[in-house]
């Protein structure tokens, strides 16, 4: 069967939607120094983080970037909107479009690799980007877009349309109730908006071995008060990656329209993304052996060339805020996404230490339709000496999944070798799940909840206490892929409390603590399970956290101690994937960012984590370390402006992971690894009109470290890290 016969046409829709809504005024607060002070300090450059005058806590405008603009000390807290990290009892940090450009980051994994609290992981026998936040699985599909669940493209998200990648660490059902897998945290994406200064940027890029791409970024504001804005991003990139025969192609088109009025603010986003992977390395199936194999050569491809995945997404979102009266705002958002994934997957199943394996086959045809929305009212008032910031809201998400598959029989799978891989013909399909060309509904998920929260402040908001609760209802239904009849269902609802406190003994220090709970649908069973594709049920988790945050103007950071308890999923003796145990993660997180010396910028973080299993089958693995979770993970990033050459900057980043285990018995140990990335960029003005050109060059994994990067949560697949990779880009702003 050829690909064309089973892949329906999805033409690129070049549809520009016009959104006409009311007008905005922006308030600007100018800070002026008198002439005497300027003369006194004329040879002293003062660098500190200053807030954007239009930023309002709880709204949709992103938290101002810190210093050089690569990091933001805050981000979106779901329905509570954008918040400064110093004012909330939660751990959150944002990475900006400037970091994305400067590091030539093309996907979300490239961005979150700057944070030790997030561990990138490859998907179950495919090319998906998934993550572990605080040691707990987070599906890339469950990222939010401006706080709205179910809107981001499936599996791999391109960064070209993004202004921010924001990482919230910890259970977050109060804030992001409609999301699915974010027990250990959440990743929120903020789309680009037109700025007051017009944006016109064209770029070309190259990534080894032969990936070449082009991009266009246009933004402009219109109207007497710049109240209308439009931002357009276009990207196309294709070629072979650093691993031989690993071919990839990306096409992205997005438009963001917004309106800033005196009382009303609104935005509309529409995007199209298609990702194609051909012949790239997938995970190695180690479920049939009791050891970790030695590594193949760094650029050797042990996957068959006929393996592929095509993923196409279309998504749209409308948001609106309206100031009812002073300090009281109504907000609403609504979005929808259509996704189609079709692929032929082949993960080599290892047989022995010599590298002999079998090349199986799994064809998947999947359609996902998602609708999501939220609405609410937030406001401020005072009762005596106590200030109140309240929020009442409702959010909901529905998802309809149509999945069909067909796969080969183990006895028919041809023999290959992961060290000396020969190309073989794909084996014939022997078992089938549903009508492959016209899948029936295989699953439906509905999640909805009411939010009530109040942040009380005393002593001029030196002491802040946040109390909130969400009544969350989750319904999960699985259907037989052949008959369409319901096979099983899960239904649960409960009130989930969240409370936290922030105390600021000094203006630059915040001490905080929180207790949060989450209720959400669990992940789907991997393709190695007998119940492949089915939801594992509903997860109820709890977190306790204490910490400290600091912002000294030129340098900031945080220290957190936390504990999370949740049900754990693994394969039972019948190879069914389900919630068969419990996991407790205790850890310490440290973050540091800023510019301690002029021209020297740092972004460093470290996580110490103990992920312990309990309530395992017959208690055999109680007390063992959870699969794929290193006890220590650290990132050290630095930039240095090289003088006297204006615009020349050297960059470096060191990532280190401690050892981890690939099975619950802790008998399969994955060694620790360290990677080093180096780069340089040069920004120069080309003419008197100040047209700018920026040249960036970098090498990821400079030492060509050959390492296993981790294992999936079930312990089925082992993933190899990326080899040495060269990348160059040129951007021209006009």
Task: Describe the residue ranges of each PLM region.
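Surface-exposed extracellular loop regions of Gram-negative outer-membrane beta-barrel proteins
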Residues: 276-289, 398-403, 498-545, 550, ...
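Outer-membrane beta-barrel translocator/receptor signature
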Residues: 160-163, 174-253, 259-265, 314, ...
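Conserved C-terminal beta-signal and adjacent last beta-strands/turns
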Residues: 20, 390, 513, 544, ...
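Gram-negative outer-membrane beta-barrel transporters
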Residues: 460, 563-565, 579-664, 731-733
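Acidic/polar loop-and-plug regions of large Gram-negative outer-membrane beta-barrel proteins
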Residues: 237-241, 254-323, 336-368, 411-439, ...
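Membrane-embedded beta-barrel scaffold of Gram-negative outer-membrane proteins
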Residues: 319-323, 327-335, 339-345, 512, ...
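Structural signature of Gram-negative outer-membrane beta-barrels, strongest in the C-terminal barrel
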Residues: 258, 368-370, 387-391, 395-399, ...
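Acidic, small-polar-rich N-terminal luminal/periplasmic segments of exported/outer-membrane proteins
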Residues: 43-197, 546
